[in-house]
């Protein structure tokens, strides 16, 4: 826990080298401090529960269904994507999925995974790319879910 005179109203938590650092205003009461510490410890535990092995297993299943098991890739949840649901680095075939999607329905997660897998084949949102993504029977529904939840900022997703 780190108290700061500059910090007036906000509380911040960071994980650095697997340690949780909580930044608090210096004028915060002990009761409020305890409440925030409990809240941030719970937040950290939730972050730990993101299961990359289950994500990889599901991505491999979708690779078999939609890409005939031809893609080689890595995939993991990340906590630093606030404006995207997923991203793909075409060059090293690395997929990152926002931890925000861990709370979304499975069919929405599947849509985002398929979308990112398709970027391994087509790095842009070309017609061929969209043909692949739209093979997913819940593609339109998932896009609607992301829009309705205010999560989707890019209409091309």
Describe the residue ranges of each PLM region.
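Active-site-proximal or metal-binding-adjacent scaffold patches in catalytic folds
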Residues: 1-111, 120-157
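Walker B catalytic acidic pair
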Residues: 116
């Amino acid at each position: 826990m780190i108290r700061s005179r500059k910090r007036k109203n906000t509380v911040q938590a960071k994980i650095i080298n697997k340690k949780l650092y909580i930044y608090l205003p210096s004028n915060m009461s002990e009761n409020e401090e305890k409440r925030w510490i409990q809240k941030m410890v719970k937040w950290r535990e939730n972050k730990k529960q993101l299961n990359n092995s289950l994500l990889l297993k599901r991505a491999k299943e979708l690779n078999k269904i939609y890409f005939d098991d031809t893609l080689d890739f890595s995939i993991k949840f990340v906590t630093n994507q606030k404006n995207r649901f997923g991203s793909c680095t075409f060059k090293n075939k690395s997929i990152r999925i926002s931890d925000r999607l861990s709370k979304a329905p499975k069919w929405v997660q599947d849509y985002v995974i398929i979308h990112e897998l398709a970027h391994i084949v087509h790095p842009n949102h070309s017609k061929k790319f969209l043909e692949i993504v739209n093979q997913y029977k819940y593609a339109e529904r998932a896009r609607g879910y992301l829009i309705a939840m205010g999560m989707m900022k890019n209409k091309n997703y």
